[in-house]
Amino acid sequence: MLTSSSHHGRSYDVFLSFRGEDTRKTFVGHLFNALIEKGIHTFMDDKELKRGKSISSELMKAIGESRFAVVVFSKNYASSTWCLEELVKILEIHEKFELIVVPVFYDVDPSTVRKQNGEYAVCFTKFEANLVDDRDKVLRWREALTKVANISGHDLRNTYNGDESKCIQQILKDIFDKFCFSISITNRDLVGIESQIKKLSSLLRMDLKGVRLVGIWGMGGVGKTTAARALFNRYYQNFESACFLEDVKEYLQHHTLLYLQKTLLSKLLKVEFVDCTDTEEMCVILKRRLCSKKVLVVLDDVNHNDQLDKLVGAEDWFGSGSRIVITTRDMKLLKNHDVHETYEIKVLEKDEAIELFNLHAFKRSSPEKEFKELLNLVVDYTGGLPLALKVLGSLLYKEDLDVWISTIDRLKDNPEGEIMATLKISFDGLRDYEKSIFLDIACFFRGYNQRDMTALFHASGFHPVLGVKTLVEKSLIFILEDKIQMHDLMQEMGRQIAVQESPMRRIYRPEDVKDACIGDMRKEAIEGLLLTEPEQFEEGELEYMYSAEALKKTRRLRILVKEYYNRGFDEPVAYLPNSLLWLEWRNYSSNSFPSNFEPSKLVYLTMKGSSIIELWNGAKRLAFLTTLDLSYCHKLIQTPDFRMITNLERLILSSCDALVEVHPSVGFLKNLILLNMDHCISLERLPAIIQSECLEVLDLNYCFNLKMFPEVERNMTHLKKLDLTSTGIRELPASIEHLSSLENLQMHSCNQLVSLPSSIWRFRNLKISECEKLGSLPEIHGNSNCTRELILKLVSIKELPTSIGNLTSLNFLEICNCKTISSLSSSIWGLTSLTTLKLLDCRKLKNLPGIPNAINHLSGHGLQLLLTLEQPTIYERLDLLRIIDMSWCSCISSLPHNIWMLKFLRILCISYCSRLEYLPENLGHLEHLEELLADGTGILRLPSSVARLNKLEVLSFRKKFAIGPKVQYSSSMLNLPDDVFGSLGSLGSVVKLNLSGNGFCNLPETMNQLFCLEYLDITFCQRLEALPELPPSIKELYVDEHLALRIMEDLVIKCKELNLIAVTKIEYQNFYRWLDSIWSDVSELLENSQKQQLDDMLQLIPFSYLSTAKREEVLKIVIHGTRIPEWFRWQDRSATTMSVNLPEYWYTENFLGFAICCSCCFYHSARSYDVEFEGSMHHYNYDSSYWKEYEEPSYDFYERDSIEITAKLTPRHKGMRTEELKKVCSFSMNVLRRATAVPNMCFAFFPFNSLCHISNLQANNPNDYGIFETCLSPGDIRHRGKQWGFNLVYKDETGGSVTHEMLINR
């Protein structure tokens, strides 16, 4: 038997698929005997099936445990559904890279199989007639035949002229060749690689005929070779020949390139080494011999251009359809060789990294409980690098906790040698200046801005453009959002190299700093110094470190970074080396720099939080300085003279409290890009003129005392952001019009601003808010096509400019909370580009003179005096209007009769228009209406014409808010007629229906005709005692508890799509009384919530029905409560993950699924609510002991999108070929908020089919899975009162359900 089979834990080498009546006693019989004679363990159904076994299950299992599948196509093969199902399974495993398919065309042409014509067409005609209800199955059969027929195989009639003996011998040869050829990959290696292979497959473009070269690149140990192996195994049988040359770089350490050329040719042509002594001559031979062959070649770990030139020189070396795959650490090699596509392999995501580590450290996908915390430390250390995960996982396999702890401590100082050696290979190939750049980044500058680094390296003479480019191409660093980054382990490697330098030039470790500054270390060699921890210094040592005597010895010091506070050290610094290029000194204690400090090549200077009063007297020539940061220097009273700092790009003076003015020369810095002076609260004056032509950002935020803005020169065309928030500026100069590129103008809380120049309309976006003294806006002279967006909030204007219509490009206008505005200019008609008009809470606005024709979105939220759109002619022109939002408009008592003319309206929101009591009868003419939102209105009846709204998807007539700000409650809902929604049944397009808080007794029987309905909310409908039959499309149901208990069983059975039931506890008639009592007597509410109503509800769920083959979705229930039922066998209060070893035979035919329950308290960020009831307001606070018990102040759940519960089954033993089964369900915050701010119980039932489809059970025994794990995320949930647990659910003798605990007791 071939050893490869047993090595991989496979039961068979070859699986034979054939039509018995055609070939069992002829071709297949002979092939089977030949395979057995050669020692190839072969599965043939009549030879291997054991008595009493299910034939189908046995076959499926045999396919999954085979290395090869030989499919013998004969005339009657397609007539057997058994054969076709077998073929589908073969293809499924083949596409997971785990099975090699060898098609044999016995007495049919390959095109007959591929196209299903001839004899196969007759079979499929019958199938399509007999399997009308299962067309998907027929399509799967067709697809499988087509795909397998496209694999290179053996055509007995045409290739072998009918000679069965020759054909069988060639099949044997191919199998032997491919056993030696195919590169093994364990399941552990494939973690996280599936998505990468999918992407690489798309880059190969197997559908194209030409030659295609694909490059795979990335840092060492990231998984390039693994990806290439998986890709090779997936596709090599589609080529005439294939060769995987592994580790070319290492291979050439022991052999010549000529030898490698000969190896490549020998493997591709299956010939002996050719007699040749010259690489150039060998190139000619390779091209001549391979130019007509379709080949797959993988060159792994290439590191030199010559290797590519001599092995895969050009496209014309290979035949049409050939594919060349190259893996390398150096992307530049791929560019130089003109590969068609490149793909970078990235490190693993956290969950994938944990899985890979577990498979090596524990030989399974889940860890042992006591190692979980340490596991995360190790995985975080690796940064998701597969090599590191494998090495450390194998190192810690079967070790105890003490060894783990010791290893983690050791890794901090001495990284694992094998990992570092692999990473260092790329570093060793660098030029000296490239090595210097890399070491500077690793020791000091990871995460720094690329522009700053370029300036530093240029001043250091390191050729930064070429150097940084090379480091990126070799995967040693990467650029992310203009910052230079590197992998954690790459930084460890770089720092390790820096420590081993002799003498040390870069000092970054605290233990080395002391020796460097006051010890015997050669100080004259030091180029970089990082000072981080003063605690290491004894009394007097810190003073010496900063003394002139010590610092004068650091003559070559380029980089000085001090990150800590001085902590009692107040002595002046007497000396700083003039060699400094980068000086970063936080909390510098001196008032100024030493007088002899002349750093002529200084590039970067930051002195955040220092005691500097002035940097130096007079002007200094600092021609290389690009960044000066003096932020939080609270004593700074004077800025330097900038006349000789001509290349300054960024000047940051943020929060310099004592600064009254800046040097006038700042206005003439031609290269200045950023000037940040925010929170300079004493600043009174800027230079009279600013002509910094490169300036892009000017931030004067919170400069309260700044009264005047300077004149702007014409060359100021690059400024994009100007922030004047909370300044004391009274007016802006007309010359501001020269800021032609301004995109972001912030004028928030400019309390002294009284006027704006007309040039303000030259800016694209204008947002003016809380400018209390601004009484008017300037007129627009002539048409202006600049301003696109205008937002006015809390300003004191009484009207818009009469010339507002001249803003011909304005497309967004929002006027919010402007309490004095009473009218809009009639020229608003002229806003021909206006698509959005929002008039929000402008309570004195009396009329809307017109609506521009282009309007798309019209909002009049909260308007009190607006005489609604009564003009009969305006609707004829509003063909583009899609959204009308008139919510909270208490003045509206009716909608215009002509609203029906808005035929393209999609959303109509009239919620909380309390005086609105009816809808127009012609509402049904809004034939494109998709959402009708009428919450909290006085509407008592839907017009019959709504039956015509055949595109309506959302219908909401909620009569109250869920608990939250401004809760509104109306007694009108108690007396609604039962036929208020009589037309519902005709709204077949409705997807979401909200009837919460209504007082009707019945819903129409036609509800079951809402075939698209997925969301139904009937909470707080106290008078509703029963439900009509609901449509089977329902997915989410929000319902009161009294109703849920009555309908649960019937609902689950009939609504096949149902996956969420959210249950509320509060009875409608007690709603107001409950609000009054919740804050004063919370303990009683809490006691009631713990009556275990969930237990009663769960007894009603037909779990047996949920576990049928047709139901694969998780059922979720949300209900009030704090304690989970006792029958949840495995429970926890602290951990967010639980893992248990299942009993040996936990799975039986009666097993239904896994039940998981979690109690959590989700609360609102508001601390009080206003409730309106029959005209009076009531205010409620909930700062009670109850909330203090359940709140976690450091965590607000509303910042999360959802809470997720995961169920996962893992194989019992290592080496099993079964993959883990996993299913995730989520409870969105929108659902959990509806539980009225009391503790929630989240219950999830995972039918076994949701983890493992019933068809998979034919190939896998569920009892092979011995570990069940469930986790609750987000994983940082840490609030008091949380409890959760799970159990296994089985079917009992009566058809009901029992838990595993109950089963054991029986």
Swiss-Prot record:
Q: Which reaction does it catalyse?
A: NAD(+) + H2O = ADP-D-ribose + nicotinamide + H(+); NAD(+) = 2'cADPR + nicotinamide + H(+)
Task: Tell me its EC number(s), please.
Answer: 3.2.2.-, 3.2.2.6
User: Which GO biological process entries does UniProt record here?
Assistant: defense response; signal transduction
Q: Where is this site: Important for ADPR cyclization?
A: W82
Tell me the impact of changing W82A.
Loss of NAD(+) hydrolase activity
Which cysteines pair up through disulfides? They are none
| Residues binding NAD(+) | R19, G20, E21, D22, T23, R24, G52
Q: Which UniProt keywords apply?
A: Hydrolase, Leucine-rich repeat, NAD, Plant defense, Repeat
Which residue range or ranges hold the TIR domain? 10-179
Highest taxon listed in the record's lineage: Eukaryota
Q: Cite the active-site annotation.
A: E86
User: Where does the NB-ARC domain start and stop, copy by copy?
Assistant: 198-417
Q: What are the start and end residues of each LRR repeat?
A: 200-224, 252-275, 417-440, 599-622, 645-669, 670-693, 716-739, 741-763, 784-807, 808-831, 832-857, 878-902, 904-926, 927-949, 961-983, 987-1010, 1013-1036, 1045-1070
This entry's Gene Ontology molecular function terms read:
ADP binding; NAD+ nucleosidase activity, cyclic ADP-ribose generating
| Task performed by this protein | Disease resistance (R) protein that specifically recognizes the Xanthomonas and Pseudomonas effector proteins XopQ and HopQ1, and triggers cell death. An NAD(+) hydrolase (NADase): in response to activation, catalyzes cleavage of NAD(+) into ADP-D-ribose (ADPR) and nicotinamide; NAD(+) cleavage triggers a defense system that promotes cell death. Makes small amounts of 2' cyclic ADPR (2'cADPR).
In the record, the note on similarity to other proteins reads: Belongs to the disease resistance TIR-NB-LRR family.
Instruction: State the oligomer form and interacting partners.
Output: Homodimer.
Domain text = The TIR domain mediates NAD(+) hydrolase (NADase) activity. Self-association of TIR domains is required for NADase activity. The TIR domain alone is active and (slowly) produces 2'cADPR.
What protein name applies here?
A: Disease resistance protein Roq1
Q: Which gene encodes it?
A: ROQ1
